[in-house]
Amino acid sequence: MGRLDVKNSWIEFHQDEMTSFLKLAIIGTVLLGVAHGANLTAAEKETYCELRSAIQTFLCIERLRDFAAKVDELDMDKKSELKEFKKTCDSLKNCFAITRCGPNSTMDEAELFRMVEKNCEAVVYIHEDFSDCSDKLTAKKSVCFDNWDPIPDGIHLEEDEKKVEKMKKETCKRYFGKDDCMKKEIVETCSQKEWDKFREQFINLSSDLVSKCDFSRLG
């Protein structure tokens, strides 16, 4: 299975440019603002909110680094690692939830939060809800399952809209493996019911990516 991508533009933070003193000063400013936040005017509250959100995002960067490292190193067959990965997911989701100082958040924040959430859901689903069928496919040495990689590498990083659309069209064709081989493998090895759940789960998980795909061929 392919790696689950995380948006590099958020991860590539030049930490060396920020001294320890400045970090402490920033955190101190935020804590001081929390203590006096109730006395701010409407305009001041908006500015304070933006500052708090920005600093919270800064603090979330380290958790995002940890998340990215664990995604790359995650051994999909070890439940102990899955348990730790879930803790990282929960921690990161809580962290970015705090950055939303008001009812709205920036597009980048919302996109990143949604992507992290869906990546976590995908891993948890495969190793909890789909674990029995996954074990059977692994024992069978299914080539289709072993090669299955629904999300094109780098699609979230590509800035050329034409290239993105081309990648999406290719994804529609092989989202469930070459010639939709995952359907055949899951139905034969597990059950029709297992396939129905699997299909629904992964179409929902990547709804932004495959929203224009025609999966009527899957029945």
Curated annotation (Swiss-Prot):
**Membrane topology, Extracellular segments:** 44-219
**Where is it mostly found?**
membrane
Q: What is this protein called?
A: UPF0376 protein C36C5.12
Which protein family is it in? Belongs to the UPF0376 family.
- Which domain of life does the protein's organism represent? Eukaryota
Residues spanning the signal sequence? none
Its subcellular locations are: Membrane
InterPro entries per record: T20D4.11-like_dom (IPR002542), UPF0376 (IPR016638)
Instruction: Write out the transmembrane intervals.
Output: 21-43
- Keywords tagged on the record: Glycoprotein, Membrane, Signal-anchor, Transmembrane, Transmembrane helix
Topology, Cytoplasmic side: 1-20
Cellular component, GO annotation: membrane
Q: How does it sit in the membrane?
A: Single-pass type II membrane protein
Q: Which residues are glycosylated?
A: 104, 204
